[in-house]
């Protein structure tokens, strides 16, 4: 059976008190709408329609061609929002999921279980419910004496008795697609909020003698809606715990999970150790037997096996196997470190290729450069790559030694087995097997200070 999904993402999110559109706030380094759409995709939806309103273009920029779009100009309720998908889905046969764009913790497994329950029971509609520790603000699941769904009552329309019910509607549904779009036009807005409620479709189904089911999940966190910064923080904590537990169960040691932040798409090999205070952002892959030292920040980068990163910042870079980075190093975009490389304390690398076995141990800037195998860069060495207008490249061959406090003024090429004397400013190319010395000769005047004291 074909499966479709409508993702509701048109609400402005006033309670967030933000200039940023609500579903674009991030949880675990990814926007809420991306989390939801990814889960819907993983659940096997053949087509997704995202309903946008406020901030529509930014949502489209975020999701791109992962979804088709419907536009809700006025926020007149959830049933009205789903109607905006009619052009894409109205005449299709199959099951349609309706999912809220502000439920970033929902998983593909739960969506699949909801659809399976719906289809196995040949229902016209099925609502996903949960037991809430504090049900205030949620629609309540009202059951009849036999435990079957009788109604879904929104908070503002609930009686005192109904407000005591702790089984709540998640706002996530599975519908027979043609039944859904046939009944949407019959939904009325005679309620406390003057809105067209999607749960009223279930009431219409029951009135017609159709079948409406409830599928209950035991994990309330999955269906938690994020409407303000407090809920955003709770979602972040829950997502972080889920992600961290996943990695620990797959052979990764997290010394202090409560202070470790790992994005949802990060890949980490077994027997790697993550120390406290580490942030690993989206698009990062880390190998096996590696140590990521405390307070390191790594984003969109690849780190190899048996490598150690100590208190460093790495963005859009690659680091090979058996390599050491830090402490207090910065790898900027397009920094590429080979195997058995050392980049030490207070070294900055940008758009540079440092080959296997090379060392840049202290207080250096390596930018727009290529460093050959086993070359050693002395303390305080700088590739002078910028003339105020353009960037130029420095190339250093293999097995070379660059003395301390040197300036390599690009464009410049240094060959293999080259020795650059400490304190030199190199402006010309240096051929293989050469010594280059470019500094003033030392002048010493014995007794000079004694003469000045007389």
UniProtKB/Swiss-Prot annotation:
The keyword Methyltransferase does not apply. Its main location: cytoplasm. Residues 1-229 are annotated as: Pyrophosphorylase. NCBIfam families: glmU, PRK14354.1. This is Bifunctional protein GlmU. InterPro entries: Bifunctional_GlmU (IPR005882), GlmU-like (IPR050065), GlmU_C_LbH (IPR038009), Hexapep (IPR001451), Hexapep_transf_CS (IPR018357), NTP_transferase_dom (IPR005835), Nucleotide-diphossugar_trans (IPR029044), Trimer_LpxA-like_sf (IPR011004). It holds the Pfam family Hexapep. Residues 251-454 are annotated as: N-acetyltransferase. Its cofactor is Mg(2+). HAMAP family: GlmU. Binds 1 Mg(2+) ion per subunit. Mg(2+) binds at residues 102, 227. Keywords: Acyltransferase, Cell shape, Cell wall biogenesis/degradation, Cytoplasm, Magnesium, Metal-binding, Multifunctional enzyme, Nucleotidyltransferase, Peptidoglycan synthesis, Repeat, Transferase. The gene is glmU. In the N-terminal section; belongs to the N-acetylglucosamine-1-phosphate uridyltransferase family. CDD domains: GT2_GlmU_N_bac (cd02540), LbH_GlmU_C (cd03353). GO terms for biological process: cell morphogenesis; cell wall organization; lipid A biosynthetic process; peptidoglycan biosynthetic process; regulation of cell shape; UDP-N-acetylglucosamine biosynthetic process. UDP-N-acetyl-alpha-D-glucosamine binds at residues 8-11, 22, 72, 77-78, 139, 154, 227, 332, 350, 365, 376. It is an enzyme of class 2 (transferase). Its EC number is 2.7.7.23, 2.3.1.157.
